[in-house]
């Protein structure tokens, strides 16, 4: 992949851009195999490769510059700004969307926030696309509510220019710290969420819910999880750290008793919408802490699926699963190092199969899916 910003030394977010893509995949696979060398897997499946450009469905842009000539991109620690509207990780048509947003920022008088001076209003724009429909969600992250009326008044022009923007909102983030979003969300449109479809499964994206940024690989990851689980012929499962329900909904059928747990109420609302659309009556989603939920239960289902944040599932949940010994654990991870530590702590389990999914090309990061089977006495 060619990137003018990388070549010019303006952006090095893609740390591995100087490696061939085949070398990137090989290095990631070797890294994963080294991490799991003490817990040998029965089956190592080949890594799932990604598109190398145009694969991202979400842009998180720092807004800088002036209200007349805003920039959308990133802010270096030394205060330098870089416009990344031509970033090749996004589909090319995102550039036209960004240009219209820049014009709108000027029309609406949304002064970019100046970090050094602690002045201005508009901090970020967050753009997400549904690949299924082409519809988009646009969020303006503002320092205060001062410009809300001004923003809303100017919206008809933006909606005329970009009719694919079906969800538009403002998030209020008043603190000076480098926090992407705040607690308050103001939605300006009739539609409150985007609908995405992976493998025939409807999934929903609300403004403050997490969703994977590489839809092709996310779709393959969910489909693989569903296929592995169906081969086990189970009737009950938990989906811990379930997000918008992508994993559990791919694994469950109308007979499966599925409980999905996620701390984010926004994500749980999305998961419930999906389950309702699919007519899954034995599926339940709850907005709770996954570890606290599990530790409170005296009985476990046949399979526990975990998809934790980068820190892993942690000591308490590892000890609980070791003690309660569900027959299967399906572990999905965005941090293979913490996953390897967790698996090492699950001493009574063996890895039946493991596969790498290249969710983040041109970086050292990747997703892993591992099926663990209880092998204790």
From Swiss-Prot:
Signal peptide stretch: none
EC number: 2.1.1.189
GO molecular function list: 4 iron, 4 sulfur cluster binding; iron ion binding; rRNA (uridine-C5-)-methyltransferase activity
Catalytic reaction list: uridine(747) in 23S rRNA + S-adenosyl-L-methionine = 5-methyluridine(747) in 23S rRNA + S-adenosyl-L-homocysteine + H(+)
Record key words, sorted: 4Fe-4S, Iron, Iron-sulfur, Metal-binding, Methyltransferase, rRNA processing, S-adenosyl-L-methionine, Transferase
Any GO BP annotation: rRNA base methylation
Positions annotated as active site in the UniProt record: 334
Binding site for S-adenosyl-L-methionine: 212, 241, 262, 307
Family: Belongs to the class I-like SAM-binding methyltransferase superfamily. RNA M5U methyltransferase family. RlmC subfamily.
Function: Catalyzes the formation of 5-methyl-uridine at position 747 (m5U747) in 23S rRNA.
Name of protein: 23S rRNA (uracil(747)-C(5))-methyltransferase RlmC
Gene: rlmC
């Amino acid at each position: 992949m060619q990137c003018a910003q990388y070549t010019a030394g303006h952006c090095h977010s893609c740390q591995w851009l100087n490696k061939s893509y085949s070398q990137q995949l090989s290095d990631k696979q070797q890294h994963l195999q080294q991490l799991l060398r003490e817990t040998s897997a029965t089956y190592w499946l080949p890594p799932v490769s990604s598109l190398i450009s145009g694969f991202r469905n979400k842009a998180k842009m720092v807004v800088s510059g002036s209200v007349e000539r805003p920039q959308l991109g990133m802010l270096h620690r030394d205060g330098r700004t870089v416009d990344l509207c031509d970033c090749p990780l996004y589909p090319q048509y995102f550039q036209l969307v960004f240009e219209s947003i820049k014009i709108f920022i000027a029309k609406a008088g949304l002064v970019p926030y100046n970090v050094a001076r602690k002045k201005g209003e508009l901090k970020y724009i967050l753009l997400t696309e549904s690949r299924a429909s082409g519809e988009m969600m646009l969020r303006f992250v503002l320092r205060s509510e001062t410009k809300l009326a001004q923003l809303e008044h100017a919206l008809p022009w933006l909606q005329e220019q970009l009719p694919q923007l079906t969800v538009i909102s403002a998030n209020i983030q008043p603190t000076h710290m480098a926090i992407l979003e705040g607690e308050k969300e103001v939605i300006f449109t009739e539609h409150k969420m985007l609908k995405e479809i992976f493998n025939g499964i409807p999934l929903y994206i609300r403004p403050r819910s997490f969703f994977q940024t590489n839809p092709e690989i996310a779709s393959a990851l969910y489909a693989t999880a569903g296929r592995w689980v169906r081969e086990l012929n189970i009737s009950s499962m938990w989906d811990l750290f379930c997000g918008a329900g992508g994993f559990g909904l791919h694994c469950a059928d109308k007979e499966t008793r599925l409980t999905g747990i996620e701390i984010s109420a926004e994500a749980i609302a999305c998961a419930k919408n999906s389950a309702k659309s699919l007519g899954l009556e034995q599926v339940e989603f709850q907005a709770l802490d996954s570890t606290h939920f599990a530790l409170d239960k005296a009985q476990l289902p046949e399979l526990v699926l975990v998809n934790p944040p980068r820190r892993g599932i942690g000591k308490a949940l590892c000890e609980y699963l070791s003690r309660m010994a569900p027959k299967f654990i399906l572990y999905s991870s965005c941090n293979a190092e913490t996953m390897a530590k967790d698996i090492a702590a699950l001493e009574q389990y063996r890895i039946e199969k493991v596969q790498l999914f290249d969710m983040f090309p041109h970086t050292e990061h990747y997703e892993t899916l591992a099926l663990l089977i209880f092998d204790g006495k």
